[in-house]
């Protein structure tokens, strides 16, 4: 598998002004030059979803790009990544919020995060349900070192016409939260992947997580 230069350039142009988060789970640490190749093409942000693989790449990558954590994160792994990533996308339970607060406070830093919402109420997906979101936001005062910047969602694997409904629901939820919680800078919406990013962009996504489409 090699970097698909034409696809990378095309996608970078298509997602503007949203940020392309290159999901690099397909890139082995022995192929770290692929990250450097992506960076030369204009990719500045890499998304990892496995802590051990991320740490290996982090130690071996010598470029100027940033890393974000886009996968499900176990609370006991927070301490290994909190000072190495610029954003944690998938805060999906209170135990994770508490651990991020604990580890960020230890290091005297603010950790930007997104709250993962299970907008379609899928049993197979992580995230808070819509009905729980206000409770989450009302609890944020207990986590002064956690800086919530917006929402993250994963669309169900269904027809694109149906998927669009869930992107719209997430966009509208963020807009309501912006009005109801003006004390927080809620300006990020992480949704859309290789197979559905066009629909996500139509509904205000600011971060597109793409992996397989960048390679061939």
Predicted feature locations:
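Conserved alpha/beta-domain cores
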Residues: 1-176, 180-195, 201-203
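A short, acidic, flexible beta-alpha connecting loop/helix-capping segment that sits on the rim
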Residues: 194-198, 213-216
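Active-site-proximal glycine-rich helix-loop-beta segment
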Residues: 204, 211
